[in-house]
A protein has these predicted regions:
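Surface-exposed, secretory/extracytoplasmic low-complexity segments enriched in Ser/Thr/Asn/Gly/Pro
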Residues: 1-134, 139, 186-188, 193-196
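Exported/periplasmic cell-wall-interacting domains
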Residues: 111-114, 126, 130-196
Length: 196
């Protein structure tokens, strides 16, 4: 099963991704993708051999993506372009959101992590807490530990170079109306693709 895992696992792998504007990006890391549960599969195989049975079946997965297409991302995902401070959200191949954002503050060492992540949870409302702050938000969608997408009522501008000196603690600050559209159309497990 290790050999199968090497062949079929995509969890945290390096993948090629076509961006909203047609560029090819190499996406490394994150926690999205498929990974065969080697312990469960080894146990199943051992028991099948002892019992003398054969079966065509899907393997047990420790982690699973939403799609088994070529890139396993499919056509429902959030894409965050850190360099251009732009976020897009596609659902079933239809563009629902295209918005400027403010990501992690580069100068303070709070850059938003890059990679392909699975949306971990959804909360509305929520209070985001860290050293020296407690920020109430209406829409909270974490994808990498304490980093996530959320509305930011304290901001009046998004996009441009704001993130370099006045960015977030790593989160993706989003206009409230756009965060609402994403929140109301996304589900846990959807891929979040973040790149520079």
């Amino acid at each position: 099963y290790k050999r199968q895992g090497y062949k079929y696992d995509t969890f945290g792998c390096t993948r090629t991704f076509t961006t909203y504007d047609g560029r090819q990006k190499t996406i490394k890391g994150g926690d999205y993708g498929w990974a065969i549960d080697q312990t469960a599969e080894t146990e199943w195989l051992y028991n099948a051999i002892l019992a003398g049975t054969t079966e065509v079946r899907q393997p047990a997965y420790a982690y699973s993506g939403l799609c088994r297409d070529t890139n396993d991302i499919g056509n429902t995902y959030v894409e965050i372009d850190l360099t251009n401070q732009r976020m897009v959200f596609y659902k079933d191949g239809q563009l629902l959101v295209d918005t400027p954002v403010v990501t992690g503050c580069v100068r303070k060492g709070h850059s938003t992590p890059t990679g392909c992540f699975a949306l971990d949870a959804m909360r509305s409302p929520a209070v985001l807490k860290g050293p020296g702050y407690a920020s109430p938000v209406t829409y909270w969608m974490p994808f990498s530990g304490g980093v996530g997408i959320h509305d930011a009522s304290w901001r009046s501008q998004y996009g441009g170079q704001i993130y370099i000196t006045n960015g977030s603690h790593g989160c993706v600050n989003t206009p409230k109306d756009k965060a609402a559209i994403i929140y109301n159309n996304i589900s846990v497990g959807v891929p979040i693709v973040v790149y520079e």
